[in-house]
Amino acid sequence: RESLTSYAKYASNSRGWDLADSDGYGTPSPEAIEWLKQVQRELGERNGDGSAVPAIAFQHIPPQEFYDCLREVPAYTPNAVEGARTFAGHCYVLDRDVCRPGSRLGEAIGCADENVGEVQALRDAGGYFALFCGHDHKNSFVGHVHDIDLGYAPTCGFECYGPKSRLRGIRLFEFRENNPVSYVTRLLTWGDLVGRYSSNELRVFFEDHCVTDLIGIRNELRRPQVTVTLLGIGSVMCAAAGHAIAKLFKRFKR
């Protein structure tokens, strides 16, 4: 019995930016999806009972089902994030009913324009209890939809864009061999391990607030702290302009 497979971990190639497949991000190939199903059958046969082995999968780009961890809200909702590409024009926040405590949505989910049925394939294969992705550096939520956990880990370094320094980190997984489905996961963040600030907070600030399109601008304006800051700057500028006009008026009056 000691030679039996208790649980498995798989990595799938989501193929990045693949213009041969779509106008947007690529998707796992049909061969990769078939492999994810076939390997479960093979492990079940090796174990002798044909039962699906509890398994967790990892890949870079999330499938469209990650949007099912969100709830659509009006565009004026504070901290709402506008969807990307196929989901553009719709605004979302985390669905707290399906997401674990501590989950964060920091940016749009950057998935492929096409749904190739990967999540459904994992369900059909049996045994898969979670799929975790990266790609969207500011996201760190874990939600349970379609009978499977869908989750993120944020960026952990400082050579690329991401959230505030204290929110960058790695995701730790703890599995029990006798029940891997009831796993425990948590983030080990820079704020917890090192401190709140990095050695280059100016760069981190720019990366956190940098926008490259209208969607990014709208998302920034939904962040209350950004709105308050802009209102404060606007108030100071209006006060300064009013003071200058008053001085100019007095000069003409003389």
What are these regions (language model features)?
Residues T5-S6, Q64-D68, N139-V142, E159-C160:
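Short catalytic/ligand-binding loop motif for oxyanion handling, primarily in non-cytosolic enzymes
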Residues G16-D136:
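His/acidic metal-ligating clusters that form di-metal
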Residues C133-S140, A239:
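Extracellular low-complexity, Gly/Ser/Thr-rich intrinsically disordered linkers
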Residues T227-F249:
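Hydrophobic alpha-helical topogenic segments used for membrane insertion/localization
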